[in-house]
Amino acid sequence: MVNDKILYDSCKTFNIDASSAQSLIESGANPLYEYDGETPLKAYVTKKNNNIKNDVVILLLSSVDYKNINDFDIFEYLCSDNIDIDLLKLLISKGIEINSIKNGINIVEKYATTSNPNVDVFKLLLDKGIPTCSNIQYGYKIKIEQIRRAGEYYNWDDELDDYDYDYTTDYDDRMGKTVLYYYIITRSQDGYATSLDVINYLISHKKEMRYYTYREHTTLYYYLDKCDIKREIFDALFDSNYSGHELMNILSNYLRKQFRKKNHKIDNYIVDQLLFDRDTFYILELCNSLRNNILISTILKRYTDSIQDLLLEYVSYHTVYINVIKCMIDEGATLYRFKHINKYFQKFGNRDPKVVEYILKNGNLVVDNDNDDNLINIMPLFPTFSMRELDVLSILKLCKPYIDDINKIDKHGCSILYHCIKSHSVSLVEWLIDNGADINIITKYGFTCITICVILADKYIPEIAELYIKILEIILSKLPTIECIKKTVDYLDDHRYLFIGGNNKSLLKICIKYFILVDYKYTCSMYPSYIEFITDCEKEIADMRQIKINGTDMLTVMYMLNKPTKKRYVNNPIFTDWANKQYKFYNQIIYNANKLIEQSKKIDDMIEEVSIDDNRLSTLPLEIRHLIFSYAFL
């Protein structure tokens, strides 16, 4: 027993050689003796022992016929500074456990974290079949199959066909910490050299190792992030087949490093390699993510293709930021006012008034070209969501002088106004109508603006229905044509089954009270059961016809005169007094009258503000000044 403890203590303190060990064993010391759960061999083989002697190890093993071989902690041994490959070979030949996991990693991964691992040791261990990634996981991919039922014909081009979606394992998408990963991330420690030979061997042993990702990033990403970078190491880890998304993540991380580490200099060789032959989509997404003009300019300076084409693609397919446009202009791109605005609108979601304003103010005009190049197509802005309503309204106000056709229709015959009605955008509907949108357009399916308003107001919950009713009043108060009215009446009469809600009578009354202003006889003939209601409406109509300014009644002012001519009436006390009235049925007309008064006041204020002494505008007759501003703003 005494010799057992002496042998253990000598091994524990590393104060032993083969001769003394042999003597103690011959004196009866037992190499299998345990103290605190440790045998002498287990106590001796530790990373704290900087001088593990092979002959001592072999003696402790052979004296008991290698029964204690797994007391030799191979994880501890691989962390020591004096690994003997012949000893490793012997241990492996004698059956030492090499496939175990300790603290979540295997022995090859553990060895990769040491300060100066040897290629021969890697080769010995990997040739024994130890995995290069002890905890590999796989991604998934979506499998899409079209459902075809027996006896049914399906058009494969029909967007309404049914599809079955399933998730399958993607064995090409490998995820986990590899030997290469462990080797790279530990190189940033003091005294830990980065060996090109080690990297080349590991990659040659398993080429796919470069494609493994941990937290969605490759080993190259971590190398550029943590280590002092050498081109030859970069080249060994780099693969042009990495996804464009990952390459841009690597480049972003590399460029940002200059703000994290002092004296870090950008190597243009690395920037060029990461940018070379990359899909511009990823490059532009990277520019958006950086939000730093210095970094964006660094990328653009190394971009070898056309910056002009890059700008066009940017405004066409990406969320646009003004600072990125400015950087492109600084690198030689030319911003065109209408060309780039029209491209900007083509991407769904591009609805930033600040971007539109910047392009309008700073974009160049195309000279000596077709007039269409100097107009803006606003159709791609629609349909819009209510959450973006104010943004779209701001954009429309900015683009107003350049809109090519406010009544442009799509392939279904739907106008911009029609789309805004469907999305219950009250402010957009009002602005469009005030600026010339045609309320009488009929779609290919026979809908009028009035029709869709009535149907949707009848279908939706009260909160939304109120918006459609308000829009209906706005449209009708502009008085549709008799052709539009007849189309609406015919459609609603043919599709009575659509009206199952409780709003249908009140909705029809709203229509009728304006229809009679257009064609009284026709309306009465179509809605004879509403004669009593029509009679009540006539009383308010008569009141509007009785109030006159120089022989012109209020209905004529509101509906028969053009905008500049109306300006002569709106400041008249008779008109302003009438605009203060409260009608039961026609308050929308009163609302329109007050809006005219408000707009007229704005024009008067603007004229006064800009009419300075000796100003050219101030020399014009007041009526001419009113006419100019009326056409521009009323």
From Swiss-Prot:
Any single GO CC term annotated in Swiss-Prot or TrEMBL for this entry: cytoplasm
Disulfide bonds: none
Induction entry: Expressed in the early phase of the viral replicative cycle.
One Pfam family matching this protein: Ank_4
Segments annotated as ANK repeats: 36-69, 70-100, 103-134, 175-211, 307-337, 412-441
Organism superkingdom: Viruses
Function: Plays a role in the inhibition of host immune repsonse by counteracting the action of interferons on early events in the viral replication cycle.
Membrane-crossing residue ranges in chain numbering: none
Entry protein name: Ankyrin repeat protein OPG025
Alphabetical keyword list: ANK repeat, Early protein, Host-virus interaction, Inhibition of host innate immune response by virus, Repeat, Viral immunoevasion
Gene label: OPG035
Example GO molecular function: RNA binding
An example Gene Ontology biological process: symbiont-mediated suppression of host type I interferon-mediated signaling pathway
Signal peptide: none
